[in-house]
């Protein structure tokens, strides 16, 4: 039997050394040996863990490959099925990307969608969206400047990145948006097919009218920011009225006036008219369409006037329409701007898009419309590319400047109104026709999807 000697304690050594001769059996000494059963169990466990890890890695790889293939093919149904069948994979990806809870995931998904849609509307819209999402970008260690530069360097990669972030952060919201877009595409396709079958005999006539209307718009560089905002506002009114009102407030849309935004042709041959005050009116296609600031005119009559008008009248109407939209938005937004920041707003005119990041969203919207207004005034006078010095000089003539009195500011707005009146007078009835026709262009021609002007108005030009 083993014995131990601990310091300070009596020895446990057997003192009677003759005890062995007493015929007592010797206690056997056992050496510690490996437990084969335990070792085998541990080995099998390790192998099982490795197999399970390999299986998990393979499952993750298969999922990512399948999802990537479905995404590349724009197969929304396949992506939905994968997400529904493998929620654990979505959760794993979310945790890996720092998406830690449902509320945060929804915020990230919404921000990604906002940035993606804003980028499609142009630099100014993207800048406004980046400014709005500064706190969320900061949580990822990003600045608006960095994100904006990444977009400018590779717009397609930016579009893909924001789309995938939305997909992984909030799959439900992502697929809801995709379904709504698909629904709109289906509706547009049905409308297009109905028009093709019912109006095949009028194809050549309508084609000539489309081209004539498109030329009038492009020749005058029809409204950009304002037209995009009106179109988006009209769509939001149908899907989310509360959000539409918030958007109108931010974009400088006067929801009290009854300004015509959109004319939509229905399957039964009637038309629905949408106005900025949120009202809708349905009538026959030959029924005159009214709106604030225009004399009532039917859609066919409007197209006929544009088709017969000379280029000078078309251009004057286009510039007048652009100037009017910009002035309306400037008037609405100007009430919200701190006059102490007017100097900064005016300087931003020549400092490029990055400088605008220092402006508030309302000031950015104001500047977008101010630029459009100056272009509408300058373009008819110069007939050529507009230089920065020209823009700066005209800004002093028509926009508020540091030190301007209230009377001086009012005088400048009257001068801008005078420019609009002159253009309106040159255009004659073509202006009314263009207001109605341009409101109908976007809806009717989107189904063909041939071309998008700088204003966001889509049409076919051959």
From Swiss-Prot:
Alphabetized Pfam families for the sequence: Inj_translocase
Keywords, alphabetical: Viral genome ejection through host cell envelope, Viral penetration into host cytoplasm, Virus entry into host cell
Superkingdom in the source lineage: Viruses
Coiled-coil segments: none
InterPro entries on file: Inj_translocase
Residues spanning the signal sequence: none
Keyword Chloroplast: no
Tagged with keyword Ligase: no
Its job: Component of the phage injection machinery. Required for injection of the phage DNA into the host.
Family note: To phage P22 gp20.
The protein, known as: Putative DNA transfer protein p33
Organism: Acyrthosiphon pisum secondary endosymbiont phage 1
Gene: 33
């Amino acid at each position: 039997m083993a014995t131990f000697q601990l310091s300070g304690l009596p020895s446990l050594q057997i003192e009677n050394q003759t005890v062995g001769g007493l015929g007592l059996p010797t206690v056997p000494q056992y050496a510690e040996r490996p437990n084969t059963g335990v070792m085998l169990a541990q080995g099998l466990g390790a192998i099982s863990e490795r197999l399970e890890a390999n299986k998990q890695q393979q499952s993750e790889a298969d999922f990512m490959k399948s999802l990537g293939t479905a995404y590349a093919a724009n197969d929304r149904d396949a992506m939905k099925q994968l997400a529904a069948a493998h929620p654990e994979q979505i959760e794993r990806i979310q945790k890996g990307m720092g998406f830690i809870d449902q509320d945060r995931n929804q915020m990230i998904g919404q921000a990604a969608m906002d940035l993606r849609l804003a980028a499609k509307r142009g630099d100014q819209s993207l800048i406004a969206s980046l400014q709005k999402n500064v706190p969320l970008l900061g949580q990822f260690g990003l600045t608006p400047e960095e994100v904006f530069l990444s977009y400018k360097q590779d717009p397609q990669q930016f579009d893909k990145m924001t789309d995938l972030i939305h997909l992984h952060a909030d799959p439900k919201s992502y697929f809801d948006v995709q379904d709504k877009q698909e629904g709109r595409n289906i509706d547009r396709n049905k409308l297009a097919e109905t028009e093709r079958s019912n109006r095949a005999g009028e194809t050549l006539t309508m084609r000539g009218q489309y081209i004539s209307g498109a030329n009038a718009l492009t020749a005058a560089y029809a409204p950009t920011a304002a037209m995009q905002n009106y179109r988006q506002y009209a769509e939001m009114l149908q899907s989310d009225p509360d959000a539409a009102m918030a958007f109108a407030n931010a974009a400088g849309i006067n929801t009290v006036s009854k300004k015509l935004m959109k004319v939509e042709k229905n399957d039964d041959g009637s038309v629905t008219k949408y106005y900025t005050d949120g009202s809708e009116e349905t009538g026959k296609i030959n029924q005159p369409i009214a709106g604030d600031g225009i004399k009532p005119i039917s859609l066919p009559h409007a197209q006929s006037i544009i088709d017969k008008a000379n280029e000078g009248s078309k251009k004057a109407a286009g510039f007048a329409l652009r100037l009017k939209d910009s002035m309306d938005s400037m008037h609405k937004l100007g009430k919200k701007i701190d006059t102490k920041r007017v100097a900064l707003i005016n300087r931003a005119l020549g400092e490029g898009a990055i400088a605008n990041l220092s402006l508030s969203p309302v000031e950015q919207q104001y500047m977008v419309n101010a630029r459009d207004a100056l272009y509408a005034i300058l373009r008819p006078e110069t007939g050529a590319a507009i230089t920065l010095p020209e823009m700066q000089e005209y800004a002093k003539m028509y926009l508020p400047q540091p030190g301007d009195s209230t009377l001086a500011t009012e005088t400048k707005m009257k001068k801008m109104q005078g420019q609009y009146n002159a253009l309106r007078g040159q255009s004659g009835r073509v202006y009314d026709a263009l207001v109605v026709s341009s409101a109908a262009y976007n809806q009717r021609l989107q189904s063909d999807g041939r071309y998008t002007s700088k204003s966001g108005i889509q049409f076919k030009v051959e």
